[in-house]
């Protein structure tokens, strides 16, 4: 399939999910809980018949082998509740542009991932609130940003409310990826985040995230230290920002994101 066709197909899927938004009228009047801006996902789902959009702009800066690169993208997550404890998910980094010193500019569309999230249990009697996420990244992007085949991942998000308006989130996981020559390999995923509710509408967090834990032959471990804030404009709308600093040479030196999320 031509590389220009698949991004159009992804856009069609986004539009199709948006058409489901009117069904949100049958759901309860619950507030927004997002999966951004931190790496660790929320254990909660959006609720039956609810549609949630989480979109952003992301700028990354890196210097590797003497080449300075800046990459800009538009990470977006669409979530639709098909039940009280289950949601469908569509996620992509969207339009991606990289300026790499004397090597010129590379632009195109990132791959799209399809997934589900299952809210397993609420927090109670010392037990965390738990959610399970199963995603599959599809080789659907432009040639420059396209991965190799279907790459599945499984993550478990656990959250605890702590004294002093603090919260703790932990997310271990595993995934399967492919090298450029098609070789399959497995990798680990891990993140831990500590949040603080500053006011009823403001929260802040610090986080250590490892989206990929792998052998050096398979790209090595990618790890960041993150900090950010989120501001609830209303029960259904949130603004957020996050700064991420790379913890090793395999990770972009720095990244900054600004996001907007709303629930219908």
Positions of predicted regions on the chain:
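Transmembrane beta-barrel domains of Gram-negative outer membranes and organellar outer membranes
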Residues: 27-264
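Cleavable N-terminal export/targeting peptides
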Residues: 1-33
């Amino acid at each position: 399939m031509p590389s220009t066709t698949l991004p159009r197909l992804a856009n069609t899927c986004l539009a199709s999910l948006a058409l489901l938004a009117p069904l949100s009228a049958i759901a309860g009047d619950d507030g927004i809980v997002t999966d951004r801006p931190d790496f660790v996902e929320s254990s909660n789902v959006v609720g039956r018949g609810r549609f949630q959009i989480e979109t952003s702009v992301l700028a990354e800066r890196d210097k590797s082998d003497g080449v300075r690169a800046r990459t800009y993208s538009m990470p977006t997550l669409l979530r639709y509740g098909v039940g009280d404890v289950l949601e469908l998910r569509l996620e992509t980094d969207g339009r991606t542009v990289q300026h790499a010193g004397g090597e010129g500019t590379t632009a195109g569309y990132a791959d799209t991932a399809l997934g589900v999230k299952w809210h397993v249990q609420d927090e109670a009697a010392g037990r965390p609130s738990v959610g399970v996420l199963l995603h599959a990244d599809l080789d659907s992007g432009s040639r420059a940003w396209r991965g190799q085949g279907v790459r599945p991942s499984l993550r478990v998000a656990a959250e605890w409310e702590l004294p002093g308006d603090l919260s703790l989130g932990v997310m271990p996981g595993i995934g399967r990826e492919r090298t450029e020559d098609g070789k399959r390999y497995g990798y680990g995923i891990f993140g831990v985040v500590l949040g603080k509710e500053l006011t009823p509408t403001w929260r802040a967090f610090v986080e250590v995230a490892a989206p990929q834990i792998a052998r050096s032959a398979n790209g090595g471990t990618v790890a960041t230290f993150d900090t950010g804030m989120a501001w609830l404009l209303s029960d259904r709308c949130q603004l957020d920002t996050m700064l991420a600093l790379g913890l090793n040479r395999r990770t972009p030196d720095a990244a900054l994101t600004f996001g907007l999320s709303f629930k219908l």
